[in-house]
Amino acid sequence: MVSSGYLQAVMLLLAVQLLCFRPSDAEQEAGTVIPAESRPCVDCHAFEFMQRALQDLKKTAFNLDARTETLVLRAERRALCDCMPTNTLR
């Protein structure tokens, strides 16, 4: 079992280390900081890209929906044509 004196010494060293050594700032390590005014608006570009992608998806979904509806109507008409004479459908 570890003696209480040893535990106290370890706790004291940890406390001193936490008090004396402050964490380094990430900005200092990264180098110079570019002011926000001179940076391109990444969020704006991402938003515009996502808007265009969403519009493309909406168009594709609409086209697929219209195509599916056309195919379903064709299939229903063929099924009716198999059961009934052609002149009664019009």
UniProtKB/Swiss-Prot annotation:
<protein>
    <recommendedName>
        <fullName>NELL2-interacting cell ontogeny regulator 1</fullName>
    </recommendedName>
</protein>
<feature type="signal peptide">
    <location>
        <begin position="1"/>
        <end position="26"/>
    </location>
</feature>
<keyword id="KW-0694">RNA-binding</keyword>
<comment type="similarity">
    <text>Belongs to the NICOL family.</text>
</comment>
<keyword id="KW-0732">Signal</keyword>
<keyword id="KW-0964">Secreted</keyword>
<dbReference type="InterPro" id="IPR028147">
    <property type="entry name" value="NICOL"/>
</dbReference>
<dbReference type="GO" id="GO:0005615">
    <property type="term" value="C:extracellular space"/>
</dbReference>
<dbReference type="GO" id="GO:0003730">
    <property type="term" value="F:mRNA 3'-UTR binding"/>
</dbReference>
<dbReference type="Pfam" id="PF15161">
    <property type="entry name" value="Neuropep_like"/>
</dbReference>
<comment type="function">
    <text>mRNA-binding protein which interacts with a range of target mRNAs and may promote extracellular matrix production.</text>
</comment>
